A protein has these predicted regions:
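Sec-dependent N-terminal signal peptides
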Residues: 4-14
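Active-site/substrate-binding loop(s) of hydrolase catalytic cores
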Residues: 147-297, 301, 305-309, 336-349, ...
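A short, amphipathic beta-strand motif
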Residues: 382-389, 457
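Residue-level detector of functionally pivotal "anchor" positions at catalytic/ligand-binding pockets or at interdomain
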Residues: 390, 458-487
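Short, acidic Ser/Thr/Gly-rich low-complexity loop/linker segments typical of extracellular
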Residues: 393-395, 401-425
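A short, solvent-exposed beta-strand micro-motif common in secreted/extracellular proteins
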Residues: 426-437
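Structured interaction patches on ligand/partner-binding surfaces of diverse proteins
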Residues: 436-461
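C-terminal tail/sorting-segment detector
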Residues: 494-511
Length: 511
């Protein structure tokens, strides 16, 4: 039986003598709405408060901590506080992923995944917060833990602690993949071909702000009342765009992105139903805007097909450019794309941030084909291995599409394999491979959507001639006649090739 207790109270505060300390006495964040005149005004406000989502052309919703709200008050914009009381669902059964686990249950579930499928699943403890709660991630691959010629793929969810649809969908996705391996061909192909990483809960302090037993008092911000999705280095605004130090959660994921060269990723949120693709921070379109629209529509269209009418059709039929929606500075999506050369978009999975548990099965049915399809995209596009033409050693090479790439849309091949994975909309492209100390190489490549184009490339070192000279200086060639005497003419005689290590090779020379 489901019982829902108390929802939202709208409380107008039209005067500006509000006691700020009292307003934040119970919780370090508030939720409020306000009207705005222009998109430019909304984007300016986004620099001081955390815009959540807007329901129409002139009404916005936002979060703020005490410092942020104090700045907002200086604008003298009228607002309404939305008092979010605990929403409690009582569910007597815990079957088929229709519930929110306690924190300890979450730990146990993640541990059980790795224990039950040790040959294809590994649990990584990325870090521990001051609260003692952990950031966990599972890695899934047919040769888990080994570096292979395959893309690395990342799903994370709930960096906003009260946006929990993706939390359950991620857990269920892990379970579905592990149990389907070698029983379902698509799942088997994904596990065999991709290095899969899934983090269901990126902000456990926010999710379990009310205690480890339930998520009904979850908060958007972390325990320090910082919005983690405004806390990353930004392409336009540089380091610390929110004015805060990098949080422990942020540093954990910065470290993960440094250690694993992810090719594609997605960041799961809630509060709307839409695919949000880059950029968030500025109005520039990415070099691969047509590819982003293609994969975003693929996700949204599949959700619509596998759900009841009205799901996942927000904004542009379920997709939006981030900046066109509202500007975000310090978001993880832009960080991953610009600084880590990884294709990441943001999935807003549910209008309800913490959906009724009875709705979780419907959300799964609508989203799991899309989640798998997006994962499969990491196998497509242009891929190959870059090596040294002399030694055959793998190289970390810059890979750039001529007259196409801009704003850090190029990529690099990854050591220790030298593999690269470049995702791009179908067409013909000139692709340049370059590295210091090597001659650049440009090749023409034809690409089809949802297809693989393999191009292995060898780069020639700039000092090829000197290397050859060094090789031949180790060789001494003598021309001798049939009696063993040295011959100056070098005609119709025997060559004795003597190397410095003392070995002699005999070769008969006939003219």
């Amino acid at each position: 039986m489901i019982k829902k207790i108390l929802f939202l109270l709208l409380i107008p505060f039209l005067g500006f003598s509000q006691n700020i300390d009292a307003l934040f006495s119970e919780k370090g964040e508030i939720y409020f709405s306000f009207q705005y005149d222009t998109k430019n005004q909304l984007n300016k406000l986004s620099e001081i408060i955390s815009i959540d989502h807007k329901t129409n052309a002139d009404l916005a919703f936002a979060y703020a901590n005490q410092k942020e709200f104090t700045e907002f008050l200086k604008t003298e914009i009228e607002y309404k506080i939305i008092k979010k009381e605990a929403v409690i669902f009582t569910n007597n059964s815990k079957n088929n992923w229709n519930y929110y686990p306690t924190y300890q249950e979450y730990i146990d579930i993640m541990t059980a995944f790795a224990d039950s499928f040790p040959s294809i699943c590994r649990l990584h403890h990325l870090g521990t917060l001051n609260s003692g709660r952990e950031i966990l991630i599972v890695q899934i691959s047919n040769n888990v833990g080994q570096k292979e010629n395959e893309p690395s793929f990342l799903y994370t969810s709930s960096m906003h602690g009260d946006e929990l649809a993706g939390y359950i969908l991620s857990l269920r996705l892990i379970d579905y993949i592990l149990n389907g391996y070698e029983n379902n061909q698509k799942l088997t192909d994904l596990v065999d071909g991709i290095d899969i990483w899934i983090n269901p809960l990126a902000n456990p302090d926010g999710a379990y702000a009310g205690g480890n037993q339930d998520v009904w008092s979850a908060t958007r911000y972390n325990a320090n009342w910082v919005d983690l999705n405004r806390n990353y280095p930004d392409p336009e605004d540089g380091p610390h765009p929110d004015g805060n130090s990098y949080q422990t959660e942020t540093n954990i994921f910065l470290g993960l992105a440094d250690s694993v060269n992810f090719s594609i990723s997605a960041n799961m949120h809630g509060g709307a139903e839409v695919c949000n693709y880059p950029w968030d921070t500025w109005s520039n379109l990415t070099a691969d805007d047509n590819w982003w629209q293609y994969v975003s529509h693929e996700y949204a269209d599949s959700c619509q097909t596998n759900s009841s009418n009205g799901y996942f059709n927000y904004l542009n039929d379920g997709i939006t450019n981030g900046w066109d929606w509202y500007s975000v500075d310090g978001g993880r999506q832009d960080y991953m794309n610009y600084f880590r050369y990884c294709r990441e978009f943001t999935l807003e999975l549910s209008d309800e941030k913490t959906p009724n548990p009875n709705d979780l099965n419907d959300l799964w049915d609508a989203n799991y084909p899309s989640l798998l399809n997006y994962m499969e995209q990491s196998l497509f596009g242009i891929r190959g291995i870059v090596t040294d033409s002399i030694t055959g050693n793998p190289l970390e090479s810059k890979i750039e599409i001529t007259s196409h790439d801009v704003d850090s849309s190029h990529i690099y091949s990854n050591l220790p394999i030298g593999n690269f994975h470049r995702y791009i909309y179908q067409g013909n492209y000139d692709v340049t491979f370059s590295k210091n100390g090597y001659y650049p190489k440009t090749i023409n490549v034809s690409v089809l959507n949802n297809n693989i184009t393999v191009k292995d490339v060898q780069l020639v070192p700039l000092n090829t001639t000197s290397i050859t000279d060094q090789i031949y200086t180790n060789i001494k060639i003598l021309n001798i006649d049939i009696l063993g005497r040295e011959s100056k003419k070098g005609e119709n005689n025997i060559q004795l090739i003597k190397t410095k290590n003392g070995r002699v090779k005999k070769q008969i020379k006939l003219n």
